Structures are given as C-alpha cells and as structure tokens.
UniProtKB/Swiss-Prot annotation:
Heterodimer of an alpha and a beta subunit, which further assembles into trimers and the trimers into hexamers. Light-harvesting photosynthetic bile pigment-protein from the phycobiliprotein complex (phycobilisome, PBS). Phycocyanin is the major phycobiliprotein in the PBS rod. This is C-phycocyanin subunit alpha. Belongs to the phycobiliprotein family. It is a peripheral membrane protein. GO terms for cellular component: phycobilisome; plasma membrane-derived thylakoid membrane. Pfam families: Phycobilisome (PF00502). (2R,3E)-phycocyanobilin binds at C84.
Amino acid sequence: MKTPLTEAVALADSQGRFLSNTELQYLYGRLRQGAFALEAAQTLTAKADTLVNGAAQAVYSKFPYTTSTPGNNFAADQRGKDKCARDIGYYLRMVTYCLVAGGTGPMDEYLIAGVDEINRTFDLSPSWYVEALKHIKANHGLTGDAATETNNYIDYAINALS
C-alpha cells in the first residue's frame, strides 16, 4: 500500500541513495501530523455507529425513494437499511485507514479502484454515499488539525464518487 512514507523510501531506494534532508524533514512533519490523524481515527471509530446511523438517515431524508422502493438495492426493509449502514460504514472505515496510513493508499487500493463497477453492478447511486459522507463531515465533532486531516480524506472520497 502506498503512503507518503513508503513512496519516499521507495524513491530513494530505487535511486540507490539515502533520504535527503528535505525528504527527512517532510517525513518528520508527516509523522507529527500522524498524532492528529490517529486522534481523528480513534474518535471516528468511537463514534462510528452514531455517525453511520446519522448518515443513513441523511440519505433517507434527501432521497426518500430509497426507503419506499422495494428491492435488494434499497432500504425499504430492515435488511436494506442494514446493507445501507454497512456500506456507509465501509466508507468511514476507509477514511480511518487513510488517517492511520497517512495517505490515500487504502482508499485507492480497496475502494476507489472498484467503486464504479460495484455501484453499477448493484445499481447503487454514488449520490447516496456522497450525501452520507457530507453528513459525516458535518457531524464528526473533530476540530483543528484532526478535523483538517479527516476532511481531506472525506473530500477525497466525495470527489472520487462525483
């Protein structure tokens, strides 16, 4: 999985050299940012159920047909609602993985690479997940650098879905 740290090391190694002072300073900054990112991942994990359920409600409010249309791809019954929450939870987990990894590698490899095919195969609307992510962004309760780090990854996911 690619992260800013692994990419810097791979580049230096491919060139047969040690990391430069500039690269080391950048990596030191990334590691310092890591404390904020870990705090954010911890908070999001602790609030995951509340955030996911609130995000699902936001989707149902903005797209009421999702709860009135019968079928495997909608939330008209409890099974459908459980699937919706599961899928939103997956996006939230990807955000926490990116926070821990310090880059978009987890999202790139495990989500974005196949999201179009998954949505097309199962007839899922990306706009549902965009709405869910916007709700999470507006309600995660993080501040400062932790919020900035988190919002960057949420925005990355939103842009990939848009």
